[in-house]
């Protein structure tokens, strides 16, 4: 199921490593690698900006997605667009909390751009902020499309990085899944600051 592009789908499971750098000025806040350590994506987040926008770039700095938080929403609504665009015509999906009040176990709904009524989600995410893990499901079903777990290492604690391991199931768009993980991490950081 290609959400971003068929180029980001494989007929076999994909294992990704995601590292969130706590303090960085140059190379982005996230690095996403394959099992061999090859860089696939990175995320640029403006260091000093009033814009709540992140850009998912490929290994060659080509913009793949723009992730924009809608600050006027009560449901932590995020809008995700193709490339560097924020035009409605380039909207790929909207992510929002299933309900306004959620403690420690968030439930998020994802609506693809063609799902204008947003009554039944196209994907949903359940997770545990304590365990820093989540599962992405297709629609309102129990069909898993991806899973994420936080990896704790002594090195990651000492050098200010958070490491995540992600399994993306066959034929699922891994750029889409990476964008969800970036948004989930941001929501988690905002919740822990409140």
From Swiss-Prot:
InterPro entries membership: LOR, LOR_sf, Tubby-like_C
Pfam family, one: LOR
Family classification: Belongs to the LOR family.
Protein task: Might be related to the phospholipid scramblase and tubby-like superfamily of membrane tethered transcription factors.
Protein name (record): Protein LURP-one-related 10
Organism listed in the record: Arabidopsis thaliana (Mouse-ear cress)
Lineage: Eukaryota, Viridiplantae, Streptophyta, Embryophyta, Tracheophyta
């Amino acid at each position: 199921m290609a959400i971003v592009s068929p180029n980001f789908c494989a007929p076999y499971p994909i294992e990704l490593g995601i590292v969130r750098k706590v303090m960085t000025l140059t190379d982005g806040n996230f690095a996403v690698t394959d099992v061999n350590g090859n860089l696939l994506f990175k995320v640029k987040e403006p260091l000093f900006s009033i814009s709540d926008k992140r850009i998912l770039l490929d290994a060659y700095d080509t913009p793949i997605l723009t992730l924009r938080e809608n600050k006027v929403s009560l449901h932590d609504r995020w809008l995700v667009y193709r490339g560097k665009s924020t035009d409605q015509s380039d909207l790929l999906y909207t992510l929002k909390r299933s309900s306004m009040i959620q403690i420690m176990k968030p439930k998020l709904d994802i609506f693809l751009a063609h799902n204008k009524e947003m009554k039944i989600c196209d994907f949903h995410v359940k997770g545990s902020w304590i365990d820093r893990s989540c599962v992405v499901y297709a629609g309102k079903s129990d069909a898993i499309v991806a899973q994420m777990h936080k990896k704790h290492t002594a090195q990651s604690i000492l050098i200010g990085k958070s490491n995540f391991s992600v399994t993306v199931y066959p034929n699922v768009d891994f750029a889409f899944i990476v964008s969800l993980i970036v948004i989930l991490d941001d929501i988690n950081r905002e919740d822990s600051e409140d």
